[in-house]
């Protein structure tokens, strides 16, 4: 029996559910009934505190076009991963404990820069981790395009097209602010 954990971490974006569905579908095709998928709720928090769902094939039905993440997400700053809690355990030790307690064969992490840094740290600790790059900023080093980016561009373009029509009709100017974070590519 193979046991694979899924978690989504950091900001929300389109295609999280679709990506998990694609990975799950591949696992079920290869391993049939010999695979268990464990979904960690609220990102790395779920892995730290063993908050998880035993997922079934049916959990991945009907999610292809749904945005967001069925598992929930949270932000866990990378720089705090090694800070001990009140019991003297750092977050990495808590995550390793859950990983080994659940006898995972691999952990699939869907996340951006900080989430992938943590995934790399867990890999350096001996865990089998697969990092799937996700960000609407498209600023992850080593990738041409991250999932989430094109959806964000398409939605923003559509909204701006609609606003342009209204602005033209009423002789007004609109200023549109789109969320992004400083990019390492920009020297930030």
What feature does the model see in each segment?
Residues 50-107, 147-161:
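Glycine-rich oxoanion-binding loops at beta->alpha junctions
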Residues 3-13, 70-72, 105-109, 174-177:
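Short glycine-rich or small-residue beta-strand-to-loop segments that form or flank ligand, phosphate
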Residues 5, 29-31, 61-65, 98-102, ...:
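Solvent-exposed alpha-helices and their adjacent loops that cap or buttress functional pockets
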Residues 123-146, 150-153:
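Short, acidic/small-residue loops that bind anionic groups at enzyme active sites
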Residues 179-188:
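Single conserved hydrophobic/aromatic residue that forms the stacking wall/gate
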Residues 9-12, 40-45, 75-76, 112-115, ...:
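Short, ordered loop/turn segments at secondary-structure junctions
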